[in-house]
């Protein structure tokens, strides 16, 4: 960190720039060391200018939304963590369409769509975090995925905005192909008209299901591993004997074995060690190598 670097960042951003900001307070697992710089751009134009300056300074950076799909190492991040929480606008440019910025939460989008009696996004009520995060990994639930509902995907690369038809992007299970440095900043969703009562019933059904199967009670990142094709990660983990297993403050949930939880005082190293043990044992038993759904970010990784 240098005074000149901080001055350049502060000049570039109309929002906030924090120094040595602990990332544990910005992630759902409540672990992670400090980022050298934590920038909160005020809007999309602010983000464009920030990215240009960060790149000109050759600083590593990463985007953080709701912090639900990331595990930051205990050493923190030697670069700039960029929060999109102020990029949270939503509008309906025409009937059946909603444009949502990446920093809006999934629940805010569901509420907005419900208020306009538009259906197709109810499943997002089951997924914590932000629209940007859901799009970046093509998050899904109940047989639906986020990108399937996208008419236009709006991204930023090298400080420039690009718009693409959603159906022309390469995406699949928990995956959206993005170019190096490409950031999802917004999307236009194409939805169907629905009845308020039917939408409400579906939301209530999803809420009950989540309470019954995922009432975890401790900080977590949601599903830690992707489901292998034709398999369920939780079952493989359970059959390997990890239900309730604990390393330091990190534990495999006794309620849902694909959730790793912070029972208090956990370190990022605890989670990384536990995840490694799970992967090794499952591989030995089943021949299947589990892949993390959670992004593990160490202090030297560059975006």
Curated annotation (Swiss-Prot):
Q: Which domain of life is it from?
A: Bacteria
What does the entry list under GO cellular component? cytosol
Molecular function (GO) terms for this protein are: FAD binding; UDP-N-acetylmuramate dehydrogenase activity
* A GO biological process held by the record: peptidoglycan biosynthetic process
Keyword Thylakoid annotated: no
Q: Where is the FAD-binding PCMH-type domain?
A: 30-194
Query: InterPro entries given for it?
Result: FAD-bd_PCMH, FAD-bd_PCMH-like_sf, FAD-bd_PCMH_sub1, FAD-bd_PCMH_sub2, MurB, MurB_C, MurB_C_sf, Oxid_FAD_bind_N
Q: Which reaction does it catalyse?
A: UDP-N-acetyl-alpha-D-muramate + NADP(+) = UDP-N-acetyl-3-O-(1-carboxyvinyl)-alpha-D-glucosamine + NADPH + H(+)
Secreted among the record's keywords? no
Q: Where in the cell is it found?
A: Cytoplasm
The EC number(s) given in the record are 1.3.1.98
Could you name the active-site residues?
174, 223, 293
Function recorded in the entry: Cell wall formation.
Q: Which PANTHER family match?
A: UDP-N-ACETYLENOLPYRUVOYLGLUCOSAMINE REDUCTASE
Q: Which family does it belong to?
A: Belongs to the MurB family.
The protein's name in its UniProt record: UDP-N-acetylenolpyruvoylglucosamine reductase
Q: Which gene encodes it?
A: murB
